[in-house]
Amino acid sequence: MASKRILKELKDLQKDPPTSCSAGPVAEDMFHWQATLMGPSDSPYAGGVFLVTIHFPPDYPFKPPKVALKTKVFHPNINSNGSICLDILKEQWSPALTISKVLLSICSLLTDPNPDDPLVPEIAHMYKTDRAKYESTARSWTQKYAMG
């Protein structure tokens, strides 16, 4: 079941890729993908290229994929291990969701962080109390880690 569904999503992605994202399997392993996200132009991550790893569980799509950011990013909902705090990757997952929708959700999280459900409380606090400092730090991290 899982491999058929993953194959279908891959075909759909190749036919109609989401804006500013690309994804596909690593080598021959259909359960392990790598994706690339372009930093949204209306965010401090603009110009950055962010690598994402995707691991599909054997019971996909009934369980969410494990998705992690490989590129270091300064963000209240993404920690230094690349874990992403996004409801659809946890309790809000639904088999109707696709990798394409997940990637678009990560892009919108880059544009609109959720400081009320942070993975990194210090960054969330800065986002709420000193937006200019947050944006300049996020920009400098993007230049340092995502534009190499």
From Swiss-Prot:
Keywords, in A-Z order: ATP-binding, Nucleotide-binding, Transferase, Ubl conjugation pathway
Active-site residues, Swiss-Prot/TrEMBL: C85
One of the GO biological process terms: protein polyubiquitination
Induction (free text): By N-acetylchitooligosaccharide elicitor.
Catalytic activity: S-ubiquitinyl-[E1 ubiquitin-activating enzyme]-L-cysteine + [E2 ubiquitin-conjugating enzyme]-L-cysteine = [E1 ubiquitin-activating enzyme]-L-cysteine + S-ubiquitinyl-[E2 ubiquitin-conjugating enzyme]-L-cysteine
The UniProt record lists the keyword Ribonucleoprotein: no
GO molecular function: ATP binding; ubiquitin conjugating enzyme activity; ubiquitin-protein transferase activity
InterPro entries linked: UBQ-conjugat_E2_core (IPR000608), UBQ-conjugating_AS (IPR023313), UBQ-conjugating_enzyme/RWD (IPR016135)
Domain UBC core: 1-147
Primary enzyme class: transferase
Pathway: Protein modification; protein ubiquitination
UniProt entry tagged with the keyword Ribosomal protein: no
One GO cellular component, as annotated: nucleus
The protein's Enzyme Commission number: 2.3.2.23
Annotated transmembrane regions: none
Family to which this protein belongs: Belongs to the ubiquitin-conjugating enzyme family.
Function, in words: E2 conjugating enzyme that associates with the E3 ubiquitin-protein ligase EL5 to mediate ubiquitination of target proteins.
The protein's name: Ubiquitin-conjugating enzyme E2 5B
Species, as recorded: Oryza sativa subsp. japonica
